[in-house]
Amino acid sequence: METFVRLFKDSPQQRSDAWHAIRRTQVGGSDLASVLGLNPYKSYYIILAEKANLFKKNLNRAACSWGTLFERVSKDLLELFCQTTVIGDNIHIDGTYLGYPGHSNSPDGFCHLTLGYTQQSWEIKTIFNNVRYEATKRIPVLVEIKSPFNRKIKNSVPSYYMPQIQSGLALSPPISMGIYVEAMFRVCGIHQLGSNNETNTDIHPPESMLPLAWGIITICSTQEHTEAPQDFGTLDAETFRQLLETLYQKDQYTIHYSMPYETACPEMPNVVGYFGWKVFIFQIIPVMKHPQFLKDKYPIIQQFLRDLHTIKASPSPMETYEKICCSEESALSTEDIDNFTDMLT
């Protein structure tokens, strides 16, 4: 696994300008559900228009900021709960090296997990498993992390995330299993931190259970800031949403993370404010590699790339786009969609 990750050490770093530029010309892992017709929130034709630069992305900046903020926290918790180290969380894997030009994947990372065998099955070993296993083994896995702001967490992988995970597995030959990590975080004031269920109930519904962990996110200005820091964990819901939208402008702020279970605010210069977090659900769901996945679906990726090239090369891009939308039908059949549902079982 480590040798594989080192192959991409010089790839564009995730979320860098070079990375964004490449993704505008490729089908990335997170694009794949839309291209395959499996994303209920964004169709083939919407993402085609976005990549052809026919209109700006309709980004939910607050949700994007939330996901970015808590991706780092989720990695820290995964390392703690599974006694592992996540690597390769900033690389970009171009599919050209495996014969899939135009397709790429930017994984949330890779790590080794311990599987324990008990009652005729294997399970992922965590610090919460007080079990004497009959046997154990250590395996490398691909990591995919989600931390939804509002969506309810279920004990399964949403079908529209499965293509992203299978893409990462297909472009990572040494890896045969992925894990889908989904965490439910809640915001709290600094005074509410600790082993209790107190949270900011203006932002989130009340919680009845105790948290698995807690910590602090500190926001610093890139300019000199001398005002007293604010406890953002006590804001009302609308003001906190505005804060998340402001944090989307990453060049104005730097973000600092406490270690899990810390409750003391850090002393550092130019602190604008901080807020506490608690995690109440932290699911780790195994996903096995589907060997034929990318081979079977790559023709649809190629068709998308041809459509994209046709639009960009046209003297009348919007007119060409409209013709493509009117002339083509859905790229996937009902059987294809059923096959993806089967992967979840």
From Swiss-Prot:
Keywords: Host cytoplasm, Host-virus interaction, Inhibition of host NF-kappa-B by virus. One of its GO terms (biological process) is symbiont-mediated suppression of host NF-kappaB cascade. InterPro entries: NF-kappa-B_Signaling_Reg, PDDEXK-like_dom_sf, Restrct_endonuc-II-like, YqaJ_viral_recombinase. It is found in: Host cytoplasm. Pfam families: YqaJ. Gene3D superfamilies: 3.90.320.10. It comes from the Viruses. One of its GO terms (cellular component) is host cell cytoplasm. Belongs to the asfivirus D345L family. PANTHER family: EXONUCLEASE, PHAGE-TYPE/RECB, C-TERMINAL DOMAIN-CONTAINING PROTEIN, EXONUCLEASE, PHAGE-TYPE_RECB, C-TERMINAL DOMAIN-CONTAINING PROTEIN-RELATED. Interacts with IKKA/CHUK and IKBKB. This is Protein D345L.
